[in-house]
Amino acid sequence: MFVAMNKGILISILVLPFYLQSCSAPSTIQKSEIICGAEQLEKLLPLIREKNVALLVNQTSVVGLTHLVDTLLTYNIKVKKIFAPEHGFRGSADAGEHVRDSIDEKTKIKIISLYGDKKKPSTDDLKNIDVVVFDVQDVGARFYTFISTLHYLLEACAENNKQLIVLDRPNPNGWYVDGPVLKKEFQSFVGVDPIP
């Protein structure tokens, strides 16, 4: 668990680590088991049970073949809102297409877009929410907007004294880091942080 202070506001960020079984020798290939944060329900559920929960999720937010929203609802978790990144909650929007606020047809939960005119949850969006859970697969490329959406979600949670739980998913390109660090004058939504 990481605890960060931001202007006197304490936020807790829980990164549920994945377990990767390493090979015993370079010449021997063994099966690796990856357990994502969302699959560790025994750790997640006690942190969100009896709380009003908002989720920032998309089509990659699955536990097995079941979406995290559906999994949490099965456990009677009070999911009150869904925040949608680029491509939308169900992944049906094209790259660069504005995502609109809506109601999810399956669950009837309100979806608030964080891709379009609005990039950051407002105080009103977080009203009556106790904890926000972030679970989105990223590919580790700076220009992917999911890390920018997480950046602004972190700010909003800190500013509104809301707990944020970040569920870890392994980066498929995590072994390779390359490129210059972003210069501040080029900062934008497709490059919000000074990373390679």
Feature names for model-found ranges:
Residues V99-I129, A141:
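Glycine-rich oxoanion-binding loops at beta->alpha junctions
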Residues M1-K31:
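Bacterial Sec-dependent N-terminal signal peptides
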